[in-house]
């Protein structure tokens, strides 16, 4: 199961990309209308990405999207909808990446783990960026 979208009622909450999915040239795993685009490129030696810039493109960020890449270790990941109903649970390991678009999530490290997180800014300060589930 290399690519697992987690969706409910046609809305994507998360995307798990595990292992090394087969890619020819370039493959984006996100839809064009998502606020955050994630793809994998495989290019041969000598392939050149021509010098370029990305023009200013202002848009409103409705909800923060998180991208996590697991460099080492493993974790159990649970994805929730907006009402904290569990949608999906999966173990991820080194080399896997996932994207959280909306809803909630939790991670439990199963061993010493190193991961890289990427998300939109600006950072508005502690206490403003997360809503925790009430116990």
Predicted regions and their residues:
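A short, N-terminal "cap"/entry segment at the start of jelly-roll beta-barrel domains
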Residues: 1-42, 135
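Conserved hydrophobic/aromatic beta-strand scaffold that supports enzyme active sites
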Residues: 40-42, 51, 67, 89, ...
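Short, conserved beta-strand element in jelly-roll/cupin
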Residues: 40-44, 60-77
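Short beta-strand His + acidic residue motifs that chelate non-heme Fe in jelly-roll/DSBH
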Residues: 51, 77-78, 98-100, 104-110, ...
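Compact, glycine-rich, soluble single-domain proteins
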Residues: 55-58
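Short acidic-glycine-tyrosine-enriched beta hairpin
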Residues: 81-102
